[in-house]
């Protein structure tokens, strides 16, 4: 699951 939600809206965990 996204900790640092960079692209969590689109479903891509960029930061984490």
Swiss-Prot record:
Disulfide bonds: none
GO cellular component, one term: extracellular region
Keyword rRNA processing: no
Alphabetized UniProt keyword annotations: Calcium, Digestion, Hydrolase, Protease, Secreted, Serine protease, Zymogen
Localization of this protein: Secreted, Extracellular space
The reaction(s) this protein catalyses: Preferential cleavage: Arg-|-Xaa, Lys-|-Xaa
Keyword NADP: no
One Gene Ontology molecular-function label: serine-type endopeptidase activity
EC numbers, comma separated: 3.4.21.4
GO terms for biological process, alphabetical: digestion; proteolysis
Annotated cofactor note: Binds 1 Ca(2+) ion per subunit.
Cofactor: Ca(2+)
Protein origin, superkingdom: Eukaryota
Maturation propeptide residues: 1-8
UniProt similarity note: Belongs to the peptidase S1 family.
UniProt name for this protein: Trypsin
Organism, scientific name: Felis catus
Taxonomy of the source species: Eukaryota, Metazoa, Chordata, Craniata, Vertebrata
């Amino acid at each position: 699951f996204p900790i640092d939600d960079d692209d969590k809206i689109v479903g891509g965990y960029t930061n984490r």
